[in-house]
């Protein structure tokens, strides 16, 4: 087990390039760090162990040893983890780069075998080529990769992943790319590598190679917002932002293959990039469709629909003395935009409900209560129109000129009054609402702060470092820019 980790340790003194690239955290002094009960393969050292969350992408893919290096596969520093990373689509040229990388850093020939033979002290317990002392020579070249699926974008991190795991809660799945290359050609590459090994090590090498090179691919897993750590989220003035650490260098490569070209033909550029790299901190906004969905679900779970039957004049989120309407605790860490949406939505529904249904107190039990929760839960789904229509129908609409309308004459605060006028694009609010107007107001309140159709699916921490640097230079990392205010806001 952990053949890749052992190979990094023993091969690190072979060449100057190896000394720079093969220094991984798993072979350094251990520093204590909390684990998350997620068992899987660390993509940096490839050992099967308990994982913790990465500082660079907030996903659980690094072990408690490698976390101290703070490396991520999304860095732009050309460290070993970055060199083993490719984005889709995977081509034969990219796979050839991985094979050449292994042959460059972990060569197997007679001189290397003799070098390790001299390194291992030949005593009674070590006088043979035993797996225990020569595990670093048993590193076959396979094309297995841990694949992170960020919706339409896939990132492949190639490595020698030994062992088996149920892969529960892992943000990635293991995929075998041998069919995209050539099985016989890869077999030939490994036969040439093992030809320099002693006979007893050859059998172990071959067994490892055929066992891992022929495993079937797992079904890819879509990464969701729940897969990201909340440990690096900060809450300033009810704005949520995420602290992201990346290894950054001023050197850039236009194409993924150009980095590997420089590795073989322009090593000075690689050394310069490694020696001048630094750890750069980004404070990115956390506004994305995944988080909005999570917040809306929490909003619906904590919602107290009894408010629409009450006579409370205060905003719904500030009610603290009424046992039927108290949700103040739920908004302790909630984003202020969600709180604003909740207040306006329940205040509007309260005004419509009290205008049409005879109800006197928030302790009463009403048919509309489940529908209020459904409006919140479906506010950013395709079922929102059906849910709004159901809520409209329980308010006893009447037929006027072949159109159902509800009355609207209950008190509302001036801010909501102004917002509804802006949504309906009218100078004066009507005393009746049609279904279309009722629908437009609810959707306008939901979309006041962000247009969910334009939001990214995942946090910005999934972007490449070069992208984060460009967004920072353009001033687009802060949430104030990415609020994506709706068009109706501009018409005010």
UniProtKB/Swiss-Prot annotation:
Give the comment on domains.
The integrity of the zinc-binding domain in NSP1 is important for degradation of host IRF3.
Listed under subunit, the entry gives: Interacts (via C-terminus) with host IRF3; this interaction leads to IRF3 degradation. Interacts with host IRF7; this interaction leads to IRF7 degradation. Interacts with host CUL1 and CUL3.
Motif (pLxIS motif) positions are: 483-486
What UniProt keywords are attached to this protein's entry? Host cytoplasm, Host cytoskeleton, Host-virus interaction, Inhibition of host innate immune response by virus, Inhibition of host IRF3 by virus, Inhibition of host IRF7 by virus, Inhibition of host RLR pathway by virus, Interferon antiviral system evasion, Metal-binding, RNA-binding, Viral immunoevasion
Location relative to the cell: Host cytoplasm, Host cytoskeleton
Q: Which InterPro entries match?
A: Rotavirus_NSP1
Signal as a keyword?
no
Q: Which GO terms describe its molecular function?
A: metal ion binding; RNA binding
Q: Where is this region: Zinc-binding domain?
A: 42-79
- Please state which protein family the record places this protein in: Belongs to the rotavirus NSP1 family.
- Protein name listed in UniProt: Non-structural protein 1
| Record-level GO cellular component terms | host cell cytoplasm; host cytoskeleton
The superkingdom listed in its UniProt entry is: Viruses
Region entry Important for cytoskeleton localization: which residue ranges? Answer: 82-176
Q: What function does the entry list?
A: Plays a role in the inhibition of host innate immunity by inducing the degradation of key host factors required to activate interferon production such as IRF3, IRF5 or IRF7. Associates with components of cullin RING ligases (CRLs) including CUL1 or CUL3, which are essential multisubunit ubiquitination complexes, to modulate their activities.
Q: Report residue spans for region: Interaction with host IRF3.
A: 318-492
Q: Name one GO biological process term.
A: symbiont-mediated suppression of host cytoplasmic pattern recognition receptor signaling pathway via inhibition of IRF7 activity
What are the start and end residues of every segment in region (RNA-binding)? 1-81
């Amino acid at each position: 087990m952990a053949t890749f980790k052992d190979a990094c340790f023993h091969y690190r003194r072979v060449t100057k390039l190896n000394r720079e690239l093969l220094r991984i955290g798993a072979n350094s002094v251990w520093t204590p760090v909390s684990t998350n009960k997620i068992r899987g393969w660390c993509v940096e050292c490839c050992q099967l162990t308990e994982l913790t969350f990465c500082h660079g992408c907030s996903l659980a893919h690094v072990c408690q040893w490698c976390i101290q290096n703070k490396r991520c596969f999304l860095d732009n520093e050309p460290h070993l983890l970055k060199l083993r990373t490719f984005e889709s689509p995977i081509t034969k040229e990219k796979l050839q780069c991985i094979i050449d990388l292994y042959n460059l850093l972990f060569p197997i020939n007679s001189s290397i075998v003799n070098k390790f033979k001299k390194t291992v002290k030949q005593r009674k317990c070590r006088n043979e080529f035993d797996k225990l002392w020569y595990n670093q020579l048993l590193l076959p070249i396979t094309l297995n990769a841990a694949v992170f699926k960020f919706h339409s974008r896939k990132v492949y991190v190639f490595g020698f992943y030994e062992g088996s795991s149920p892969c529960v809660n892992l943000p990635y799945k293991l995929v075998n790319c041998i069919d995209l290359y050539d099985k016989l050609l890869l077999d030939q590459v490994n036969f040439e590598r093992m030809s320099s090994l002693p006979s007893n090590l050859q059998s172990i090498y071959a067994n490892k190679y055929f066992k891992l090179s022929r495993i079937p691919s797992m079904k890819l897993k879509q990464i969701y917002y729940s897969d990201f750590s909340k440990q690096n989220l900060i809450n300033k003035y009810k704005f949520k932002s995420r602290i992201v650490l990346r290894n950054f260098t001023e050197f850039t490569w236009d194409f993924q293959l150009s980095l590997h070209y420089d590795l073989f033909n322009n090593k000075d550029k690689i050394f310069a990039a490694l020696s001048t790299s630094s750890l750069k901190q980004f404070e990115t906004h956390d506004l994305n469709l995944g988080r909005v969905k999570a917040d809306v679900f929490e909003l619906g779970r904590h919602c107290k629909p009894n408010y629409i039957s009450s006579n409370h004049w205060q905003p719904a989120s500030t009610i603290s003395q009424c046992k039927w309407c108290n949700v103040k605790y739920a908004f302790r860490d909630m984003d202020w935009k969600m709180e604003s949406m909740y207040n306006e939505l329940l205040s509007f529904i309260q005004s419509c409900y009290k205008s049409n249904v005879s109800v006197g107190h928030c302790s009463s039990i009403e048919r509309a209560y489940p529908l209020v929760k459904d409006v919140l839960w479906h506010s950013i789904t395709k079922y929102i129109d059906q849910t709004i229509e159901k809520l409209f129908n329980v308010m006893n609409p009447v037929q006027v000129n072949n159109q159902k309308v509800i009355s609207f004459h209950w008190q509302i605060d001036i801010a909501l009054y102004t917002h509804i006028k802006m949504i309906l694009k009218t100078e004066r609010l009507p005393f009746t609402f049609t279904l279309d107007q009722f629908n437009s107001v609810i959707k306008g309140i939901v979309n006041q702060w962000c247009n969910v159709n334009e939001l990214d699916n995942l946090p910005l921490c999934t972007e490449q470092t070069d992208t984060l640097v460009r967004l920072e230079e353009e001033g687009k990392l802060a949430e104030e820019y990415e609020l994506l205010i709706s068009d109706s806001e501009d018409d005010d």
